[in-house]
Amino acid sequence: MAIKVLVVDDSSFFRRRVSEIVNQDPELEVIATASNGAEAVKMAAELNPQVITMDIEMPVMDGITAVREIMAKCPTPILMFSSLTHDGAKATLDALDAGALDFLPKRFEDIATNKDDAILLLQQRVKALGRRRIFRPVVRPTTPTPPPRSSASSVLGGVSTHTQPAPVRSSHAASIRPSGKQYKLLLIGTSTGGPVALQKILTQFPANYPHPILLIQHMPAAFTPAFANRLNGLCKIEVKEAANGDVLRPGCAYLAPGGMQMMVERTGVTGRVKVLAGSAEMNYKPCVDITFASASKAFGGDVLAVVLTGMGADGREGARMLKSAGATIWAQDEASCVVYGMPQAVASAGIATQSISLDNMAESILKESARG
Protein backbone atom coordinates (compact mmCIF):
# COMPACT_ATOMS: atom_id res chain seq x y z
CA MET A 1 0.00 0.00 0.00
CA ALA A 2 1.33 3.44 -0.97
CA ILE A 3 2.31 5.97 1.69
CA LYS A 4 -0.39 8.65 1.88
CA VAL A 5 0.91 12.22 1.54
CA LEU A 6 -0.67 15.64 2.17
CA VAL A 7 1.03 18.52 0.30
CA VAL A 8 0.74 21.98 1.88
CA ASP A 9 1.89 25.18 0.12
CA ASP A 10 0.33 28.52 -0.76
CA SER A 11 1.88 28.35 -4.25
CA SER A 12 -0.37 26.46 -6.67
CA PHE A 13 2.66 25.79 -8.87
CA PHE A 14 4.63 24.25 -6.01
CA ARG A 15 1.66 22.17 -4.86
CA ARG A 16 1.24 20.81 -8.37
CA ARG A 17 4.93 20.04 -8.95
CA VAL A 18 5.48 18.44 -5.55
CA SER A 19 2.36 16.33 -6.10
CA GLU A 20 3.58 15.25 -9.53
CA ILE A 21 6.99 14.29 -8.17
CA VAL A 22 5.58 12.39 -5.21
CA ASN A 23 3.09 10.52 -7.39
CA GLN A 24 5.88 9.43 -9.78
CA ASP A 25 6.97 6.98 -7.09
CA PRO A 26 4.67 3.94 -6.89
CA GLU A 27 5.27 3.73 -3.14
CA LEU A 28 3.79 7.22 -2.62
CA GLU A 29 0.37 8.77 -3.19
CA VAL A 30 -0.75 12.38 -2.71
CA ILE A 31 -4.24 12.17 -1.23
CA ALA A 32 -4.88 15.93 -0.94
CA THR A 33 -3.32 19.40 -1.11
CA ALA A 34 -3.82 22.45 1.12
CA SER A 35 -3.02 26.11 0.49
CA ASN A 36 -2.49 27.23 4.10
CA GLY A 37 -1.84 25.93 7.58
CA ALA A 38 -5.46 26.04 8.71
CA GLU A 39 -6.51 23.78 5.83
CA ALA A 40 -3.60 21.48 6.66
CA VAL A 41 -4.66 21.08 10.29
CA LYS A 42 -8.22 20.23 9.21
CA MET A 43 -7.15 17.78 6.49
CA ALA A 44 -4.59 16.09 8.74
CA ALA A 45 -7.33 15.23 11.23
CA GLU A 46 -9.85 14.16 8.58
CA LEU A 47 -7.64 12.29 6.10
CA ASN A 48 -5.00 10.76 8.39
CA PRO A 49 -2.02 11.15 6.01
CA GLN A 50 1.18 9.28 6.79
CA VAL A 51 3.42 12.21 5.76
CA ILE A 52 2.82 15.95 5.33
CA THR A 53 5.03 18.27 3.26
CA MET A 54 4.71 21.78 4.67
CA ASP A 55 5.68 25.27 3.53
CA ILE A 56 6.62 27.80 6.23
CA GLU A 57 5.34 31.15 5.00
CA MET A 58 1.61 30.92 4.19
CA PRO A 59 -1.50 33.10 4.68
CA VAL A 60 -4.23 32.40 7.27
CA MET A 61 -1.93 30.13 9.31
CA ASP A 62 1.84 29.77 8.87
CA GLY A 63 3.60 26.44 8.71
CA ILE A 64 5.14 26.56 12.19
CA THR A 65 1.77 27.16 13.85
CA ALA A 66 0.27 24.39 11.74
CA VAL A 67 3.01 21.99 12.84
CA ARG A 68 2.29 22.73 16.50
CA GLU A 69 -1.44 22.17 16.06
CA ILE A 70 -1.03 18.98 14.04
CA MET A 71 1.45 17.52 16.52
CA ALA A 72 -0.95 18.32 19.37
CA LYS A 73 -4.07 16.92 17.69
CA CYS A 74 -2.96 14.16 15.30
CA PRO A 75 0.83 13.65 15.34
CA THR A 76 2.11 13.07 11.81
CA PRO A 77 5.61 13.04 10.28
CA ILE A 78 6.14 16.46 8.68
CA LEU A 79 8.73 17.47 6.08
CA MET A 80 9.29 21.24 5.91
CA PHE A 81 10.26 23.23 2.82
CA SER A 82 12.51 26.16 3.69
CA SER A 83 14.17 29.05 1.88
CA LEU A 84 17.97 29.15 1.95
CA THR A 85 18.20 32.35 3.98
CA HIS A 86 19.09 33.24 7.55
CA ASP A 87 15.42 33.85 8.35
CA GLY A 88 14.49 30.64 6.57
CA ALA A 89 17.02 28.71 8.63
CA LYS A 90 15.71 30.15 11.89
CA ALA A 91 12.11 29.38 10.91
CA THR A 92 13.05 25.83 9.97
CA LEU A 93 14.72 25.25 13.32
CA ASP A 94 11.57 26.61 14.99
CA ALA A 95 9.51 24.13 12.97
CA LEU A 96 11.76 21.26 14.06
CA ASP A 97 11.36 22.38 17.67
CA ALA A 98 7.60 22.35 17.11
CA GLY A 99 7.71 18.73 16.01
CA ALA A 100 8.58 18.58 12.29
CA LEU A 101 10.98 15.74 11.57
CA ASP A 102 12.94 16.90 8.54
CA PHE A 103 13.37 19.70 6.02
CA LEU A 104 14.42 20.35 2.45
CA PRO A 105 15.59 23.60 0.87
CA LYS A 106 12.85 25.12 -1.28
CA ARG A 107 14.53 25.46 -4.67
CA PHE A 108 11.93 26.37 -7.26
CA GLU A 109 14.42 26.00 -10.12
CA ASP A 110 15.19 22.37 -9.23
CA ILE A 111 11.51 21.49 -8.99
CA ALA A 112 10.61 23.39 -12.16
CA THR A 113 13.37 21.89 -14.31
CA ASN A 114 12.67 18.31 -13.27
CA LYS A 115 16.19 17.95 -11.86
CA ASP A 116 16.71 14.24 -11.23
CA ASP A 117 18.62 14.45 -7.95
CA ALA A 118 16.09 16.89 -6.46
CA ILE A 119 13.24 14.58 -7.44
CA LEU A 120 14.94 11.51 -5.98
CA LEU A 121 15.84 13.33 -2.76
CA LEU A 122 12.26 14.47 -2.19
CA GLN A 123 10.90 10.98 -2.83
CA GLN A 124 13.48 9.39 -0.52
CA ARG A 125 12.79 11.82 2.31
CA VAL A 126 9.02 11.35 2.10
CA LYS A 127 9.37 7.56 2.08
CA ALA A 128 11.78 7.65 5.02
CA LEU A 129 9.31 9.66 7.10
CA GLY A 130 6.43 7.47 5.94
CA ARG A 131 8.17 4.53 7.57
CA ARG A 132 8.47 6.40 10.85
CA ARG A 133 6.68 4.08 13.23
CA ILE A 134 6.33 6.01 16.47
CA PHE A 135 3.35 8.05 15.37
CA ARG A 136 0.79 5.42 14.47
CA PRO A 137 -0.96 2.96 16.84
CA VAL A 138 -1.29 0.40 14.03
CA VAL A 139 1.85 -0.18 12.02
CA ARG A 140 2.13 -1.96 8.71
CA PRO A 141 5.41 -3.86 8.31
CA THR A 142 7.94 -2.26 6.02
CA THR A 143 11.32 -3.22 4.66
CA PRO A 144 13.95 -0.53 5.23
CA THR A 145 15.43 0.93 2.07
CA PRO A 146 19.06 -0.20 1.73
CA PRO A 147 21.34 2.78 2.41
CA PRO A 148 22.89 4.27 -0.73
CA ARG A 149 26.53 3.48 -1.37
CA SER A 150 28.75 6.30 -0.16
CA SER A 151 31.62 7.45 -2.32
CA ALA A 152 33.61 8.10 0.84
CA SER A 153 35.44 4.77 0.87
CA SER A 154 37.45 5.70 -2.21
CA VAL A 155 38.33 9.07 -0.73
CA LEU A 156 39.29 7.51 2.61
CA GLY A 157 41.83 5.19 1.04
CA GLY A 158 40.06 1.96 0.14
CA VAL A 159 38.89 0.85 3.58
CA SER A 160 37.86 -2.79 3.65
CA THR A 161 34.12 -3.33 3.97
CA HIS A 162 34.29 -6.96 5.12
CA THR A 163 34.39 -6.64 8.91
CA GLN A 164 32.72 -9.68 10.49
CA PRO A 165 29.58 -8.37 12.25
CA ALA A 166 29.50 -8.69 16.03
CA PRO A 167 26.40 -8.51 18.21
CA VAL A 168 25.40 -5.02 19.29
CA ARG A 169 24.11 -4.61 22.82
CA SER A 170 21.02 -2.48 23.25
CA SER A 171 21.75 -0.59 26.44
CA HIS A 172 20.16 1.68 29.00
CA ALA A 173 22.32 4.36 30.59
CA ALA A 174 22.14 2.65 33.98
CA SER A 175 23.47 -0.59 32.48
CA ILE A 176 26.53 0.96 30.87
CA ARG A 177 29.66 0.61 32.92
CA PRO A 178 32.33 3.16 32.04
CA SER A 179 35.21 1.50 30.24
CA GLY A 180 37.80 3.60 32.05
CA LYS A 181 39.33 4.77 28.77
CA GLN A 182 40.85 8.22 28.77
CA TYR A 183 39.39 10.00 25.75
CA LYS A 184 40.63 13.13 24.06
CA LEU A 185 37.74 13.76 21.64
CA LEU A 186 33.99 13.18 21.23
CA LEU A 187 32.54 12.87 17.72
CA ILE A 188 28.82 12.93 16.86
CA GLY A 189 27.54 12.38 13.32
CA THR A 190 23.91 12.63 12.23
CA SER A 191 21.47 13.58 9.47
CA THR A 192 17.65 13.37 9.40
CA GLY A 193 16.35 14.03 12.92
CA GLY A 194 19.75 15.26 14.03
CA PRO A 195 18.95 18.84 15.03
CA VAL A 196 16.46 17.73 17.67
CA ALA A 197 18.66 14.83 18.80
CA LEU A 198 21.76 17.01 19.15
CA GLN A 199 19.83 19.61 21.11
CA LYS A 200 18.49 16.94 23.47
CA ILE A 201 21.95 15.53 24.11
CA LEU A 202 24.10 18.66 24.28
CA THR A 203 21.78 20.62 26.56
CA GLN A 204 22.50 17.99 29.23
CA PHE A 205 26.26 18.48 29.10
CA PRO A 206 27.88 20.53 31.90
CA ALA A 207 30.01 23.56 31.09
CA ASN A 208 33.10 21.65 32.26
CA TYR A 209 32.64 18.71 29.89
CA PRO A 210 36.22 17.41 29.68
CA HIS A 211 36.71 16.95 25.93
CA PRO A 212 36.35 18.86 22.66
CA ILE A 213 33.33 17.81 20.57
CA LEU A 214 33.06 17.66 16.79
CA LEU A 215 29.50 17.71 15.39
CA ILE A 216 28.74 16.63 11.82
CA GLN A 217 25.14 17.33 10.79
CA HIS A 218 24.01 17.11 7.17
CA MET A 219 22.76 20.67 6.67
CA PRO A 220 23.02 23.43 4.02
CA ALA A 221 25.56 26.22 4.41
CA ALA A 222 22.85 28.79 5.14
CA PHE A 223 21.61 26.77 8.11
CA THR A 224 24.69 25.80 10.12
CA PRO A 225 25.46 29.29 11.53
CA ALA A 226 21.88 29.61 12.82
CA PHE A 227 21.95 26.08 14.23
CA ALA A 228 25.26 26.65 16.01
CA ASN A 229 23.98 29.91 17.48
CA ARG A 230 20.80 28.24 18.67
CA LEU A 231 22.66 25.42 20.37
CA ASN A 232 25.10 27.87 21.94
CA GLY A 233 22.20 29.80 23.46
CA LEU A 234 20.62 26.65 24.88
CA CYS A 235 23.68 24.74 26.10
CA LYS A 236 26.04 25.18 29.04
CA ILE A 237 28.96 24.19 26.81
CA GLU A 238 30.08 26.52 24.05
CA VAL A 239 28.86 25.63 20.55
CA LYS A 240 30.25 27.33 17.45
CA GLU A 241 30.37 26.80 13.72
CA ALA A 242 33.85 25.42 13.07
CA ALA A 243 36.37 27.67 11.34
CA ASN A 244 39.62 26.64 9.72
CA GLY A 245 42.41 26.69 12.31
CA ASP A 246 40.20 26.48 15.41
CA VAL A 247 42.19 25.00 18.29
CA LEU A 248 40.22 22.26 20.05
CA ARG A 249 39.23 23.14 23.59
CA PRO A 250 37.49 21.03 26.25
CA GLY A 251 33.83 21.91 26.71
CA CYS A 252 33.48 23.38 23.22
CA ALA A 253 31.51 21.82 20.36
CA TYR A 254 32.51 22.60 16.77
CA LEU A 255 29.73 22.23 14.18
CA ALA A 256 30.89 21.36 10.67
CA PRO A 257 29.96 24.17 8.25
CA GLY A 258 27.39 23.26 5.62
CA GLY A 259 28.81 22.78 2.14
CA MET A 260 32.30 22.08 3.51
CA GLN A 261 34.32 19.21 4.97
CA MET A 262 35.64 19.28 8.53
CA MET A 263 38.82 17.43 9.45
CA VAL A 264 40.99 17.40 12.53
CA GLU A 265 44.75 17.23 12.94
CA ARG A 266 46.90 16.65 16.02
CA THR A 267 48.95 19.55 17.33
CA GLY A 268 50.89 18.51 20.40
CA VAL A 269 48.56 17.61 23.25
CA THR A 270 45.49 19.00 21.54
CA GLY A 271 44.19 19.30 17.98
CA ARG A 272 43.14 21.78 15.36
CA VAL A 273 40.19 21.93 12.97
CA LYS A 274 40.69 22.00 9.21
CA VAL A 275 37.76 23.19 7.09
CA LEU A 276 38.08 22.40 3.39
CA ALA A 277 35.90 22.57 0.31
CA GLY A 278 36.54 18.88 -0.30
CA SER A 279 35.93 16.79 -3.39
CA ALA A 280 32.88 17.48 -5.54
CA GLU A 281 32.32 13.72 -5.83
CA MET A 282 31.32 13.38 -2.18
CA ASN A 283 27.64 12.72 -1.55
CA TYR A 284 27.59 14.77 1.64
CA LYS A 285 29.02 18.13 2.65
CA PRO A 286 29.74 17.90 5.49
CA CYS A 287 30.48 14.19 5.48
CA VAL A 288 30.66 12.15 8.69
CA ASP A 289 33.07 9.66 7.12
CA ILE A 290 35.59 12.41 6.34
CA THR A 291 35.66 13.78 9.89
CA PHE A 292 35.73 10.33 11.49
CA ALA A 293 38.56 9.19 9.22
CA SER A 294 40.70 12.23 10.01
CA ALA A 295 40.11 11.71 13.73
CA SER A 296 41.26 8.10 13.46
CA LYS A 297 44.59 9.31 12.08
CA ALA A 298 44.97 12.21 14.52
CA PHE A 299 43.72 10.65 17.77
CA GLY A 300 43.65 6.89 17.17
CA GLY A 301 41.83 5.07 19.93
CA ASP A 302 41.38 8.14 22.14
CA VAL A 303 37.98 8.87 20.58
CA LEU A 304 34.35 8.22 21.52
CA ALA A 305 32.27 8.38 18.32
CA VAL A 306 28.47 8.36 18.24
CA VAL A 307 26.27 7.88 15.16
CA LEU A 308 22.77 9.29 15.56
CA THR A 309 19.59 9.18 13.49
CA GLY A 310 19.94 9.74 9.77
CA MET A 311 19.25 8.40 6.30
CA GLY A 312 21.91 6.49 4.37
CA ALA A 313 25.21 5.05 5.57
CA ASP A 314 27.45 8.09 6.07
CA GLY A 315 29.74 7.43 9.03
CA ARG A 316 30.09 3.68 8.56
CA GLU A 317 33.49 3.68 6.83
CA GLY A 318 34.92 6.40 9.03
CA ALA A 319 33.68 4.54 12.10
CA ARG A 320 35.31 1.38 10.77
CA MET A 321 38.64 3.21 10.62
CA LEU A 322 38.14 4.57 14.13
CA LYS A 323 37.35 1.13 15.51
CA SER A 324 40.44 -0.32 13.83
CA ALA A 325 42.46 2.36 15.64
CA GLY A 326 40.93 1.35 18.98
CA ALA A 327 38.20 3.98 19.32
CA THR A 328 34.80 3.37 20.92
CA ILE A 329 31.77 3.49 18.59
CA TRP A 330 28.15 3.84 19.70
CA ALA A 331 24.93 4.02 17.69
CA GLN A 332 21.47 5.35 18.47
CA ASP A 333 18.91 2.56 18.79
CA GLU A 334 16.23 1.97 16.17
CA ALA A 335 13.23 2.80 18.35
CA SER A 336 14.37 6.37 19.07
CA CYS A 337 15.59 7.24 15.55
CA VAL A 338 13.64 9.39 13.12
CA VAL A 339 15.35 7.37 10.37
CA TYR A 340 17.31 4.24 11.28
CA GLY A 341 19.79 4.42 8.43
CA MET A 342 23.18 5.69 9.57
CA PRO A 343 23.04 3.97 12.99
CA GLN A 344 21.83 0.76 11.37
CA ALA A 345 24.74 0.83 8.92
CA VAL A 346 27.22 1.05 11.80
CA ALA A 347 25.42 -1.47 14.00
CA SER A 348 24.72 -4.12 11.35
CA ALA A 349 28.36 -4.03 10.23
CA GLY A 350 29.45 -4.92 13.76
CA ILE A 351 31.24 -1.60 14.24
CA ALA A 352 29.14 -0.21 17.10
CA THR A 353 29.48 -1.86 20.50
CA GLN A 354 26.43 -0.21 22.07
CA SER A 355 22.99 0.72 20.74
CA ILE A 356 21.53 3.40 23.01
CA SER A 357 18.22 5.26 23.04
CA LEU A 358 18.20 9.01 22.57
CA ASP A 359 16.76 9.47 26.06
CA ASN A 360 19.78 7.68 27.55
CA MET A 361 22.49 8.92 25.21
CA ALA A 362 23.61 12.06 27.08
CA GLU A 363 23.89 10.29 30.42
CA SER A 364 25.75 7.41 28.79
CA ILE A 365 28.24 9.75 27.11
CA LEU A 366 28.83 11.66 30.33
CA LYS A 367 29.50 8.45 32.27
CA GLU A 368 31.88 7.14 29.61
CA SER A 369 33.65 10.51 29.28
CA ALA A 370 34.22 11.04 33.00
CA ARG A 371 37.86 11.19 33.92
CA GLY A 372 38.94 8.64 36.45
Curated annotation (Swiss-Prot):
Keyword Hydrolase: yes
NCBIfam families recorded: PRK00742.1 (NF001965)
The protein's name in its UniProt record: Protein-glutamate methylesterase/protein-glutamine glutaminase 1
SMART domains in alphabetical order: REC (SM00448)
Protein family membership: Belongs to the CheB family.
Any single Gene Ontology cellular-component annotation: cytoplasm
CDD domains reported in the protein's UniProt record: CheB_Rec, REC_CheB-like
GO biological process: chemotaxis
GO molecular function: phosphorelay response regulator activity; protein-glutamate methylesterase activity; protein-glutamine glutaminase activity
Cellular location(s): Cytoplasm
Sites of 4-aspartylphosphate modification: D55
Recorded superkingdom: Bacteria
Location of region: Disordered: 138-174
Domain (Response regulatory) ranges: 4-121
Entry annotated with the keyword Ligase: no
